[in-house]
Amino acid sequence: VKHVRLIRHGESAANAGEASLDHASIPLTPKGIEQARLVVSSFTQAPDLIVASPFSRAQATAMAVVAAFSYVPFETWPIHEFTYLEPARCANTTVAQRRVWVETYWAKSDPGFRDGAGAESFLDFVTRAQSFLHGLAEHPAENIVAFSHGQFINAVAWLIERKPHQIDSRAMADWRDYEITNHVPNCRGYMLTLHPGDSDWKWSAAES
């Protein structure tokens, strides 16, 4: 049986209400660093593989586990957060300052829409989540831990639970409701399982 522990990064500066230069370089707060340390103590055995998003806050969270299990392979996969607003427009803004832009984006409910240079569409985002599940299924490691982000984690869970037939406006609205309802706290996440010969992943809430 393949087990994948999917964990959101520790508290970041943006989570704490601070302005951020860009989506990729947001650092952890001291609280986030401590949360990452606590994740290590929750492991009862070493994983076969440690994976992290390329974004700084996920890499920093993963480093505590990498340090504890230095002999375990560590890889960076494209499981970064959904960047749906143009990064240049968001430079040096806070979550509160971006709220109107966020609401406008979701009200449009257009899966193929890209906000600008460096932004991805909802369809791009879901395709990444689908590729992640495929990559996990194909990987020889049986016990994997992956450090990612709240929206990406919920895209994975939504795909497993809802099994959408097509990514249209209705599916996009459904995912947005799902994400708001199932907020993933820092350093928490889901446990994914895949049984031999089965093509359907299962998921459950995982304590971190």
How would you describe each model-predicted region?
Residues 3-7, 142-151:
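Beta-strand elements within well-structured catalytic alpha/beta cores of enzymes
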Residues 52-53, 127, 147-148:
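Short beta-strand scaffold positions
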Residues 27, 66-130:
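Phosphate-handling substructures
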Residues 44-78, 100-108, 184-208:
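Conserved histidine-centered catalytic loops in small-molecule metabolism enzymes
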Residues 2, 71, 82-96, 158-208:
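Acidic, low-complexity terminal tails and accessory targeting/binding regions
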Residues 43-46, 136-142:
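Glycine-rich phosphate-binding loop signature in dinucleotide/nucleotide-binding domains
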Residues 2-75:
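Active-site-proximal alpha-helix that buttresses catalytic centers in soluble enzyme cores
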Residues 131, 135, 139, 146-149:
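His/acidic metal-ligating clusters that form di-metal
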